[in-house]
Every structure is written in structure tokens, then in C-alpha cells.
């Protein structure tokens, strides 16, 4: 007489992909048998579900639809150096109970481990290949140093950010604390300045890597950025684990080029639920299309006992207007890897 949970999601997993639990019982032959699944999100009971065996005595439960409706990834506009992105990640677990008998009654139960579900939506092949340890900044992670930030930017190409532009990098961590390091270099690779900022534990953190934000929140100055050609961003777990705990060193080149046209910096949610950015440097076109919705009423009006057709009385009546804004963005020449990245991010 027991429930056994056989399969659970990865410790960190994406909300818009299957979040699957499987479980079985040795009491499935009992009358009126079913499983009762209680889903807990951030420690509170979210919903209760009745599930029936699907493959012999085994059943499954997908928490994706329930948990993804609770998540959001708002654009960060407050110039904080780091943001605890708790709106974009939740901790979930389930309690599975047996229910059977005449009348059916709740019997024994089993509780799953906790899972961190972030506001991601991976393409199916990416989801099948996803391993949370490739992104976990933690001293308990044997894959450190070098784990990845939550972006698919092609690492063989240069990422650019202007002095007055915004750029964000996100990471997951199950460590107890970590720090963020910024290093500025000149055009021949000489270190100009370095600064570390220590932070307490967050499950999902977004670093605002914008030059203005860095200058506001660290000892790095405008003069340092004026002398720099690029800078590196690295985060490192500083907990009690035995491994290095460091992420990759993400290199950002400072875009000081004079552009003929007004540039447009586009920000969008990537597949991990974190903001990616790209600057379009050629001429952009804004347009607005106005659409009207209306009806034709019967012509003519009554004038006493006569029905007349005055010039002032129209037939076409508009009751609503809508405007659709369109922005056509044009890039300068870009590398094929970057072009493919943009197509995958924005169109597919």
C-alpha cells in the first residue's frame, strides 16, 4: 500500500514545456481507484487534480499549464544592477494520494522533490537537450567554471552595447551567495578596471549590464568606459561547495560608432524568459494604419407626415476606429550566425 513517484522534472525546468511527473501504486486494482494530485506553487496549494492510471498502474501529471500562468518576465527599467527575478520563477512540488474504495476515500500519499520552474519556452529539440547544470552558477556544480548565461547569442560573434543602451544577462543558481564581476579592457587587451559586487541568494537573477547601470552601481566611472573597447561580465557562486562556481566570461563590446541614421535598440523575451537585445542601425520606417468600423443606416428622415432626404443626413456611420503601428527595422551587414540567431529569436 504505497504511492511511488517514478519521474520528476529537472531541478530547474522551463514552464512552457512539459513539466511531467509519473507515479504508480500497488493498489490500482481496488474499486474506484484514482490518484489525487495536489499542486503546490511557492508553498501554497494551487490546485487539486484527479488522475487515472494510463499505462498499467502508472499515471502522469503535467504541471506546465498551471505554473506558467503564474509567471511573468517584466522589462527591468529601474537601473538596478541585479534583479531577483522572482516573478519569472516559482518553486513547485506535488503530493500524490491514492483514492479508492466504496465509497472512495483518500489513502496513502507521496511527496515529490521541489522543482524550480522558470518562464521559459524551449523549442522541442532544445528542450530535449536542455540540462540545468549547463546554466547553474553554483559551487556545487561540477561543470563550473564556464556555465552559460541564459541567452543563445552566438558566442563566436561580438555582442555590442552602446554607452546609452541597455543589455541584460540572466542566470540560475542554487548556491547560497554569489558575486558579479565587471572588467573593462582597452583595445589591445589591457585591464583598465575591475569591480566585484557581492549578492545574496536568488534562484533566478538578471544582471543589468548597461554601461550607465554599471557606472551608477559600482566604482567604475565614465572615464573608465571612455578608455575601454570592451568589458567582461562574470558571475560566481560563493557558497560552501567544492567547485569553482563561475559562469562564462561574457564579452560586450562598446559601440562607439557614429551612425548615419537613428538607431533602434530592440528588446525581446528569449526562450529562457530573459531579455535579449539587438541594435538596428540603418534607416527605420514608422507607419500607422487607421481602420474604421461602421455601418450604413437607412437614408431619409421623417418630417411630420412626410419622409424626406435632407443633404445633411448621411448614411455611413462609424462607431469605432483602430490604429495599427508598424515599425520596419533594417540592420547593417551582419554575420550569418547573428542573422540566424535573429531569425530564430524573432520569427520562428
Regions found by a protein language model. Name each.
Residues 1-227, 236-257:
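Preference for solvent-exposed, low-hydrophobicity sequence contexts
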Residues 2-4, 16, 172, 191-204, ...:
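Extracellular/virion structural assembly segments
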